[in-house]
Amino acid sequence: PDYALAHAVKGLSALMLGRRELVEVAAQANRTAQTCLQAGAATARERLWCAALDAWLRGHPSVAIARMEDALLLNPADTISMKLSHGIRFIIGDNHGMRRSVERVMHAHTEDHPLRGYALGCLAFGMEETGNYAEAERMGLQGLETALDDAWGLHAVTHVYDMTHRTK
């Protein structure tokens, strides 16, 4: 109950769903997260996630993205921070930012990284959204080899098939 990051995750997850009725859920999570931050020591990553939630609730999703990018500067292998940056960029329509953000951290998602497949799925989606269909397909299929349940990677590959008129 005193872990600020858990409350930030709850709030950011509620906002990602894009439902008006969940804004109050996010706001309550933010209030609790801020109280937790004041009560004890928090890591830099934890503070950044809380700052991202607070910024988005104040109407600044771009600032929330910037805080996730700050978290990635601390640890480029932080796949969940990468996915959150990617997701908020998707919501605001920043297709080139989606691609660049993932490209910046792929060096840390090496072959032995347990979440590499999901990172490849995000990379594939960013590539597809910026018109690089051949590379998007290659990255998406490669990601699906290790993350069979990655709906986002599968979504990226199906977008490629649709955009290249290969729907059969």
Where are these regions (language model features)?
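Inter-helical turn/loop elements of alpha-helical hairpins
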Residues: P1-E46, C50-S62, I88-R100, E129-Y133, ...
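Residue-level recognition of tetratricopeptide repeat
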Residues: D2-A6, A44, D78-T79, D112, ...
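Asp-box/WD-like beta-propeller blade repeats and closely related beta-sheet repeat scaffolds
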Residues: I65-E69, N75-D78, K83-R89
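Alpha-solenoid helical repeat scaffolds
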Residues: R31-Q34, E69, E103, L141
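Flexible helix-coil transition and linker loops at the boundaries of alpha-helical arrays
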Residues: T32-E46, L73-N75, M106-R116
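Structural register within alpha-helical repeat arrays
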Residues: K10, A51, S85, L123, ...
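Internal metal/ion-chelating core segments
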Residues: S101-K168
